[in-house]
Amino acid sequence: MKCIRLLAAVCLTWLSGQAVAAVCVQDDTNQTVCIQQAQRVLVLAPHLTEIVDFVGGMSKVIAVDGSSNFPESVNTLPKLGNPWMLGAESILARKPDLVLVWQSGISMEVVAQLRKAGVPVFVSEPKKIEQVASTMRRLSALLGTEQRSASRIDDWLQQFKSLRAEYGGRSIVPVFYQVWSQPLMTLGGQHAVSEVIELCGGRNIFVDLPNLAAQVSVEGVLKRKPEVLLASGSERDHQSFVMQWASWPQMPAVKRNQVYTVPNDILVRNGPRLIGAAKLVCAHIEQARR
């Protein structure tokens, strides 16, 4: 099986007089994370909770962060609140044998304290689709679900390749993705959302921004003439989104009523549901071509 960034060597240790294989992978900070048999896993980021579920490891999870809300079964687990507010002591009190965290969503000082206490910590920061798949593979290795989840991960990645093959060669459609309205925020070219737009044959009008997210101006959006306006949210959010931009009827996207929302979380949360979001984005961009 193709494994990304997994260490080729298997470390052998001794437990109760028997040899036990310890799986080692590198996390997204290039730190080596080794575990023998994960049984008490703390997951402190929503995208990681969804990935653990996708690879079949939820039976080993003892608690999650407060924002994890998918799958529905996660709501039966203890929720620890905002990881930024958690100290190492409160995490250690749960007696985890593996902690999964988002680099942008936790203090790295806390991570260092956990590692000093002997707890393996996997730090995640996927920015591209392939990196999400890599995270799936590495976590499945740590959780002991590698064999039964391998084909599912391959199929997930293949669906993106199929979308690119179907839409990638079509006429390019300029797209503005809105993260927030006040202040007006968007995502740059380093985020997976930009990659999704591109594989659908679109172009993020702020692909040139070096940061993952940035504040922009209405004038800047108008100048780049998007043909699709895109955001994440509910039906109620969609109506607000449409009304927000109705004051600029000269914008191609507004003039042609190409203003869309995708359901909350699935596009900006770099996890398994990203493929469902990508299919919606491709359909919206295709509609703008007609």
PLM region spans:
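Flexible loop/hinge segments that line or gate small-molecule binding clefts
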Residues: 67-73, 106-138
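A short, structured surface patch at a secondary-structure boundary
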Residues: 40-94, 98-103, 205
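Proline-aspartate-enriched helix->loop->beta-strand connector
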Residues: 38, 85-104, 119, 217-231
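Bacterial Sec-exported substrate-binding components of ABC uptake systems
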Residues: 2-49, 145-176, 283-290
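Short helix-initiation/N-cap motifs at beta->coil->alpha
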Residues: 26-28, 80-89, 209-218
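Structured C-terminal subdomain patch of bacterial secreted/periplasmic proteins
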Residues: 86, 131-141, 150, 170, ...
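Short secondary-structure boundary segments
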Residues: 45, 103-104, 179, 209, ...
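His/Asp/Glu-enriched short active-site or ligand-binding loop at hydrolase and phosphoryl-transfer sites
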Residues: 65, 190-213, 233, 261
